[in-house]
Design a protein with these regions (language model features):
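Interdomain boundary/hinge segments at the C-termini of tandem beta-sandwich modules
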Residues: 46-54, 147-154
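Surface-exposed binding patches on compact interaction domains or structured appendages
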Residues: 1-16, 83-117, 179-218
Length: 235
């Protein structure tokens, strides 16, 4: 039989068998023939167990973390998913690919075609986090990729205008009012968010004969008995 050999000794025979590289049992026969005139023979059946077949599984994702811009974007990752066959603990052949699947968890994150993760725009003022969980189909191997996305960039555009830009008063004196637009517009990632919000303001009036009225948007001119007077209201 394949793999079997013998050696005669003083007490009989030593049977030697090489390692079985196959996945099936091997068999053989030892036949002993009588050399004298009797001519009798006897046979000994030989068996050898099949190889012990095991597999070493590997599952590695690269990179181990992905960071996304707050405006949203798509990023990819790579996966090495293989198994290495071993016979009796020894490597047999080359590693072969093993299928895998992945799931994405976390607000604003989702899976896309291929090994891609999509992050939608983050309009919140806090960082978002998530995780990709990769599972090998033939084993219990699992690997993960941590996900993070920057918080939204929040800015404000301020507006301050007056209407009209000049006031004329009669010599007898009078009070006049002017319009003021004072607000701020919130922007998230450079885009308007919500409606403008009013912003408080103060007014300082200068110039002889001119004073601030009862509101921040009024000016009082006292009676003028002399030459033309000028002043300024700074908002």
């Amino acid at each position: 039989g394949v793999g079997f050999s013998y050696e005669e000794t003083d007490n009989g025979y030593d049977i030697t068998v090489t390692e079985n590289p196959g996945e099936t049992q091997r068999t053989g026969t030892l036949t002993i023939n009588q050399t004298d005139e009797g001519g009798e023979s006897v046979s000994v059946n030989l068996t050898q167990a099949a190889s012990v077949v095991t597999y070493d599984y590997t599952l590695t994702a690269t990179p181990t973390s992905l960071s996304f811009a707050n405006t949203g974007e798509t990023k990819s990752f790579s996966v090495v998913s293989t198994k290495q066959k071993k016979l009796n603990g020894n490597v047999s052949g080359s590693a072969v690919d093993v299928a895998f699947s992945f799931e994405v968890a976390g607000s604003g994150f989702s899976k896309s075609t291929g090994n891609n993760v999509v992050a939608t725009e983050n309009t919140t003022e806090s960082e978002r986090t998530g995780v990709v969980t990769i599972t090998q189909s033939e084993s219990d191997e699992v690997d993960t990729i941590n996900l993070s996305q920057a918080a939204a960039t929040v800015t404000y555009d301020y507006t301050l205008t007056t209407d009209p830009t000049s006031l004329s008063f009669v010599a007898a004196g009078e009070t006049k009012v002017f319009g003021v637009t004072s607000n701020k517009q919130k922007k998230v990632n450079g885009k308007n968010s919500g409606s403008p919000i009013a912003v408080d303001y103060t007014t300082v009036v200068s110039g002889e004969g001119f004073t601030k009225g009862s509101s921040e948007y009024s000016v009082i001119a006292a009676a003028n008995t002399g030459a033309e007077r000028t002043g300024q209201a700074v908002v």
